Design a protein with these regions (language model features):
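A Zn2+-metalloprotease active-site environment signal
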Residues: 1-168
Length: 168
């Protein structure tokens, strides 16, 4: 799924096939809705633009090489913020699920399925050691936190708050 500026959420067919319950789909929608409510796309666009302008000003001449460096620097600069935004959307999305009295296990369950699917794709793509090394680098540069850490955080949030909001 993907949250767009302006409030639209794109849900891919594969996700609909992967979800076994309305609660799982609600978990994804709660997460994506938080990206919209918190204006994460707008913040990312502005941050990239500001980074590019700042580097161009500092370096003076923004020739083709500098344009490339500015672009790379902007992307690297936003990685930490993007990871932070993903965790924030997870946390706020789970809060939304709990307050709406929707079974919070749905969000945890769909994220577990997505993690398994990600691992399955990773294994099928990484047959050689060169591909494995490039995958490790890509993993480091990923804008999303590790699936394991996200699942652990969500599980803890359910344990801490389910008695207050959700009664299984």
């Amino acid at each position: 799924a993907l949250a767009l500026p302006g409030g639209n959420i794109i849900i891919f067919e594969g996700l609909l096939k992967l979800a076994d319950s309305p609660e799982e789909l609600a978990g994804v929608l709660a997460h994506e809705a938080q990206h919209i409510f918190l204006k994460h796309s707008t913040q990312g666009i502005l941050r990239n633009f500001a980074s590019g302008v700042l580097l161009a000003l500092v370096m003076g001449d923004a020739n083709a090489v500098m344009d490339g460096l500015v672009s790379i620097a902007g992307q690297i600069n936003t990685l930490g913020f993007s990871r932070k935004m993903e965790l924030e959307a997870d946390r706020k999305g789970m809060e939304l699920m709990l307050h709406a009295k929707i079974n919070p296990q749905g969000m945890l369950s769909i994220f577990e399925k997505l993690m398994k699917e990600e691992l399955r794709l990773e294994v099928s793509k990484n047959s050689s050691s060169t591909k494995k090394n490039s995958r490790k680098i890509f993993s480091y540069l990923s804008t999303h936190p590790s699936a394991q850490s996200r699942l652990k955080i969500l599980d803890n949030q359910i344990k801490e708050n389910s008695k207050k909001f959700w009664i299984p």
